[in-house]
């Protein structure tokens, strides 16, 4: 399950439990709506509540990153586990955005706002 929020130039996603393909499709739809307004888009991605992800999500993320790598400005990821940070690093290979991993929400939001 995911919780989402959209703002001008920003998509926010919080993952709770297992990240499944239907969740990723929901994120893609929201991203496309925000992108239609103006690019590039910032992404706030909170993975602290994620229990895992399905293989089809991993593949969809690779396809999405290659398709939209240039459409991001900054990607802030909140992660508690080393494997989550590693997965974020893989995303960086195909995204042209600035990407940082944070341990807390405040740091991530400040960075997206340009304060750090």
Residue ranges and their predicted role:
Residues 1-116:
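Amphipathic, Lys/Arg-enriched alpha-helical "gate/interface" segment within cytosolic domains
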